[in-house]
Design a protein with these regions (language model features):
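Glycine-rich phosphate-binding loops of nucleotide-dependent enzymes
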Residues: 2-178
Length: 178
């Protein structure tokens, strides 16, 4: 499956960090009304709670697991949103402008975090982002759109030197005599 995050952070603000991630695990729960009524799924619930604790440890949020989502700094809220998406165990993780609103230090930490996700969880990450330094730093392949039209695809080095990309995003130099 696929999980995504949004440009604007979408957390359950009145819930703890732990509960924000646990609720995403409910997508994978095999309970029904009968098993819920008689608490027959207690083992599955205990397993999911343990998985959430492990995920929070891996993403660096274990120490704030009992904090409300709203009490976290912006960078950690973004990390929590990504952890919640990972809790659904997607094959593809879509990150929509994850660096939006971040300061340069948070953006550097985000780049490292995305690399860790790819390595530790073996996930394909589709990144939609306007921070070119971030994109060039972490992407294996880049697809560039100009008003919805694909104008280039390739490695970061190929994209940096692509004339169509340069024209579209830096503008074509006007002839001084015109």
């Amino acid at each position: 499956g696929m999980a995504r995050t949004f440009q604007n952070i979408r957390l359950w603000k009145s819930m703890t960090v732990f509960d924000n991630v646990l609720i995403a695990k409910h997508l994978r729960r095999s309970s029904n009304m009968f098993t819920a009524m008689f608490r027959l799924n207690a083992r599955e619930e205990a397993r999911q709670r343990a998985e959430v604790l492990e995920l929070l440890r891996v993403v660096g949020l274990e120490d704030v697991k009992d904090e409300l989502a709203t009490s976290l700094p912006y960078g950690k809220q973004r990390r929590l949103e990504i952890a919640r998406a990972l809790a659904t165990d997607p094959t593809l993780l879509l990150l929509d402008e994850p660096a939006a609103g971040m300061n340069p230090q948070e953006t550097l930490e985000l780049a490292e975090f995305i690399r860790e996700i790819r390595e530790k969880f073996h996930k394909t990450v589709l990144l939609i982002e306007h921070h070119m330094d971030l994109v060039m730093d972490i992407a294996d392949r880049i697809y560039v759109l100009d008003f919805g039209e694909l104008i280039a695809q390739g490695t970061p080095a190929e994209i940096q030197n692509n004339e169509r990309v340069i024209d579209a995003y830096l503008g074509v130099a006007e002839d001084a005599e015109d």
